[in-house]
Design a protein with these regions (language model features):
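N-terminal strand-loop-strand
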Residues: 1-16
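Detector for methionine-enriched segments
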Residues: 1-4, 62, 120
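Unchanged
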Residues: 21-107
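Charged phosphate-binding loop/patch that engages nucleotide di/tri-phosphates or the phosphate backbone
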Residues: 101, 105-121
Length: 121
């Protein structure tokens, strides 16, 4: 998970790595780019999970999102990393039991996230 700083409110929020799709990017290419920008890490064995509509609080307002969710494996991840995204304060592996209380998503998105994480264990 990544801890981000809202540019307007300066509030710290936890999220999964992600963000917008740039022009001519596929959702998968965008997911790989966002993971690297926000954690400094790359992953392999990517698989599409689902698409979800939700609102995400950012920059002092609720932003409507159409999320393309993927799972991936991150082999050989160390604690050293370079974060490229200026809004990301830190990244961390969070114990599964703490994910729901930390995620800044709406309840239905938190539930789906936990569902997919449990399926991966």
């Amino acid at each position: 998970m990544v801890e981000m700083v809202d540019p307007l409110t300066k509030k710290f929020i936890w999220s999964l790595p992600g963000g917008g799709i740039e022009q001519k990017e596929t959702p998968l290419v965008a997911a790989k780019r966002e993971l690297f920008e926000e954690t400094g890490h790359e992953a392999e064995d990517w698989a599409f999970l689902e698409q979800t509509r939700y609102d995400f609080g950012w920059n002092g307002r609720m932003v409507p999102c159409l999320g393309e969710w993927f799972r991936a494996r991150t082999p050989n991840v160390s604690d050293t990393h370079t974060i490229i995204d200026a809004h990301v304060r830190a990244w961390a592996w969070i114990p599964l039991g703490q994910v729901s209380e930390r995620l800044a998503y709406q309840p239905h998105v938190r539930w789906r996230t936990l569902h997919h994480l449990r399926d991966m264990i």
